[in-house]
């Protein structure tokens, strides 16, 4: 099941890393490879790879996609740190929003 196949309650349980311009960035604990983060924007849901900063699943409108990719590029090291913490089920660190 892709991102759209997950139960809405699963998304509520994901730690929030950041929120900006109506977008909510989250990450699951013990999630599957490749390393990635989840984006919610209104009714849209998507998964973006940390390395590629390309969508792995779901959809975002083009402007939102560009903004999330820009944010991801600026905070890639912090995303990797949170991915590592999530693998250890340790508390995740908040990341600054896009300014």
Located regions from the model:
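Basic nucleic-acid-binding interfaces
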Residues: 2-99
């Amino acid at each position: 099941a892709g991102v759209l196949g997950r139960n809405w309650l699963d998304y509520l349980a994901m730690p929030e890393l950041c929120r900006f311009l109506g977008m909510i960035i989250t990450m699951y604990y013990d999630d599957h490879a490749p390393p990635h983060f989840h984006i919610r924007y209104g009714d849209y849901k998507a998964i973006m790879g940390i390395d590629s900063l390309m969508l792995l699943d779901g959809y975002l409108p083009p402007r939102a996609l560009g903004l999330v990719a820009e944010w991801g590029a600026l905070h890639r090291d912090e995303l990797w740190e949170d991915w590592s913490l999530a693998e250890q089920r340790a508390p995740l660190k908040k990341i600054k929003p896009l300014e």
